[in-house]
């Protein structure tokens, strides 16, 4: 069960169906002791391995919610192997449904807490395409701490202006907190609008550029 094949009762059914072998021998008794480090365990002829914790880097696409279940939309768990779903993985933090980029899925609650705890001030870097021209004055406002329209004060953040045209900007934003729709609201406070948002990093994790959207 700890290998992600299902619940204990589901594994018992697999054993009865003679679909599991240990060191080349069919096992039907769930009480048989095995050592996952030395014994070869096969399910339908494929080797399975015991992993206490699972870590999955995903390039989340738009249109998918960062949740374990949702009645209206496809979730990020719908994009991964069901085997990992059975191991209890969950998304670490949330990306808006129309935001894409780096998302970590794991069943390591301690790591998730370290990455998400406000006390840890883990830096996250986003790249945004903005309708409107972001200015050095906007960067200064970010550095001082943007005040949102509802009066919420944001921690000081870093705004790097990568390029601008007459009516559009490409920027990178470095945040150490994660308020609801924060990047969009901070840019809105400067009188501009985010039209595309991608997360590039989360602490030491950097999005693997070889991952296609949804991988």
Report residues per predicted region:
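Basic, flexible Lys/Arg- and Gly-enriched helix-loop patches that mediate nucleic-acid binding at interfaces
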Residues: 1-215
